[in-house]
Amino acid sequence: MTALSRSNYAALFGPTTGDRIRLADTDLLIEITEDRSGGPELAGDEAVFGGGKVLRESMGQGRATRADGAPDTVITGAVILDHWGIIKADIGIRDGRIVAIGKAGNPDIMSGVHPDLVVGPSTEIIAGNGRILTAGAIDCHVHLICPQIMDEALGGGITTIIGGGTGPAEGTKATTVTPGAWHLARMLESLDSWPMNIVLLGKGNTVSADSMWEQLRGGAAGFKLHEDWGTTPAAIDACLTVCDAAGVQAAIHTDTLNEMGFVEDTLAAIGGRSIHAYHTEGAGGGHAPDIITVAGHPNVLPSSTNPTRPHTVNTLDEHLDMLMVCHHLKPSVPEDLAFAESRIRPSTIAAEDLLHDIGAISMIGSDAQAMGRIGEVVMRTWQTAHVMKRRRGALEGDGSGKNGADNLRARRYVAKYTICPAVAHGLDHEIGSVEVGKLADLVLWEPAFFGVRPHAVIKGGMIAWAAMGDANASIPTPQPVLPRPMFGAAPAAAAATSVHFVAPQAIEDGLAERIDVRRKLVAVKDVRKVGKAQMPLNDALPRIEVEPDTFTVRIDGEVWDEQPAAELPMAQRYFLF
């Protein structure tokens, strides 16, 4: 029997069980816990494509037709990083959905082939060997200010956006709201052309139940309560009353100035009901200085936006100018300046790092063009994980020492932009993880570029975005290699591989017949019983206290000191600008 060293095996087929992979230039390492595609248990039967390799006629490729159940696409030998684990496997895709995770090939001559991974003449191959596969990212906080954000989102590995807007209107620049049935219809039609799942939020700042039901029938999948529209206790209660009846989620940006009440009053108005708290730390807005305390409540689903991720020596300086622009404020007006300065507190931004690391803040979004960068959701998440490993060391249950694996930490952080927002907004029956039955919204990463630039973004089973060289070159790889749209990004393909998530009431009311869209409308699941306990690996409920005068933060009684990072991975090493 021929023996292969681990290094030679990894060069041929990719890493296997027990091998560790560094994520970009961070200090984070992940370890493969199982190899379903080869490795120690199935060595010699790996499915690999290429000249002189396995997946050829009457060898690794069998005779199974599509009618026999052959997959449309197989991703070979990828390392799956998801909230449920870190394994290596072949992934089968059929009709735009994941059909199997296991061993692909030809069962006539190969052992252990999964019955739904029988490679036939109708099967395309994407080489995942040596690469990391994650679920497409979900940006849970998007201002739809300009259509160009779609390209930036795809280029950052995002395949679903949750938010609202109508373009560069003042309401949209400040709030993630698509108000009213007419705007909802036009935005659903406009967004039909991009390879991106869409979740639009209607305006929840009203005590008019009729207005909110009208928006749900018009295509809203939930609501946004924003202080710039007046997040009063009465509006909070009215919005959540409709949400409870409809089964949809509400996202909230609370009252920074405490004009309508304090954080305790907002929590009283919420009344123990499920709610998604945007930018829970507060620099993006919310009760000053203690909105961060809501992350300790079991009914509140807290998220961050990426401009404060992680806390660095530059975070405070850039925030003041961003805030003035985003909320239509003027530096020359003292009251406007005081409003802005009250929101930016280094102590709460620093505490936000720790709350992410212990799993108390469950999600990360962008706040795109409204104090955040849509293309940096994934990158900022992993920068935070790196900073926390350097400061706190390995999590309990992870490996110790310089080369110890960080599997728990990696699974916790990937969940923040995949499964957690999917669960929070009732999307997890369709997206949010690499699991059988879900849409094949997947991202392949070269380990050296993990979290920075995807190798390929697969949307509903089609490659929609990829790193690609000069189109006039003789091969695909000559420089400049840039993230570029692929055939899956064409409007007709995008409509076939993406969905609009809407409230069940919209489907029941015949919205599909009233608007000009080609893609499928999918009802969100009932989320009214979703609480922090349903946030995978991000369900911690610490006691959080903020001193009103000094802004000192205590988490479970201990002060978390400010130590802003002066250097980050995944930064200038990868970018010219």
From Swiss-Prot:
Keywords: Cytoplasm, Hydrolase, Metal-binding, Nickel. Signal peptide: none annotated. Ni(2+) 1 binds at residues 141, 143, 224, 367. GO terms for molecular function: nickel cation binding; urease activity. Ni(2+) 2 binds at residues 224, 253, 279. The modification N6-carboxylysine is found at residue 224. Carboxylation allows a single lysine to coordinate two nickel ions. Substrate binds at residue 226. Pathway: Nitrogen metabolism; urea degradation; CO(2) and NH(3) from urea (urease route): step 1/1. It comes from the Bacteria. The keyword Metal-binding applies. Its main location: cytoplasm. One of its GO terms (biological process) is urea catabolic process. Its EC number is 3.5.1.5. NCBIfam families: PRK13206.1, PRK13207.1, urease_alph. This is Urease subunit alpha. It comes from Mycolicibacterium smegmatis (strain ATCC 700084 / mc(2)155). The gene is ureC.
